[in-house]
Amino acid sequence: MEQTLSIIKPDSVGKAHIGEIIAIFEKSGLRIAAMKMVHLSVKEAEGFYVVHKERPFFQELVDFMISGPVVVMVLQGENAVARNRELMGATNPKEAAEGSIRALFGESIGVNAVHGSDSLENAAIEVSYFFAKTEVVNSVA
């Protein structure tokens, strides 16, 4: 079973969309193997998004991600990375498929409701950034 990291971003947490987003994941067959709500520090946000450090949007992304609490989850299931990315939709909500999380809850390319790992390799790195191995439960019976 694959695992991937999902973050419900401050905009969706603030608008009380947590339950709706989790329902989309669960209805698609993805299971939650770990979950917690955190308010990221500047250091944590910069560390998580270090791959974007040289990009022009980096500081705006960090500022947004520390603007309120986020819900960090490990999703598990067959093809979890690809399924999560399909459920999220395109980064820009205006280009996201109808019914996708970003089409439903995203506002803009920067304020786009959720983050999801883009590869199995990055999923492993991202999961370990937020969770110890003992915090991740095999949720598939």
Curated annotation (Swiss-Prot):
One of its GO terms (cellular component) is cytoplasm. Signal peptide: none annotated. One of its GO terms (biological process) is CTP biosynthetic process. The active site is at 115 (pros-phosphohistidine intermediate). One of its GO terms (molecular function) is nucleoside diphosphate kinase activity. It catalyses: a 2'-deoxyribonucleoside 5'-diphosphate + ATP = a 2'-deoxyribonucleoside 5'-triphosphate + ADP; a ribonucleoside 5'-diphosphate + ATP = a ribonucleoside 5'-triphosphate + ADP. Keywords: ATP-binding, Cytoplasm, Kinase, Magnesium, Metal-binding, Nucleotide metabolism, Nucleotide-binding, Phosphoprotein, Transferase. It comes from the Bacteria. Its EC number is 2.7.4.6. Its cofactor is Mg(2+). InterPro entries: NDK-like_dom, NDK-like_dom_sf, Nucleoside_diP_kinase, Nucleoside_diP_kinase_AS. It is found in: Cytoplasm. PROSITE patterns: NDPK, NDPK_LIKE. Its main location: cytoplasm. It is an enzyme of class 2 (transferase). It holds the Pfam family NDK. ATP binds at residues 9, 57, 85, 91, 102, 112. Major role in the synthesis of nucleoside triphosphates other than ATP. The ATP gamma phosphate is transferred to the NDP beta phosphate via a ping-pong mechanism, using a phosphorylated active-site intermediate. Homotetramer. Belongs to the NDK family. This is Nucleoside diphosphate kinase. The lineage of its organism: Bacteria, Pseudomonadati, Chlamydiota, Chlamydiia, Chlamydiales.
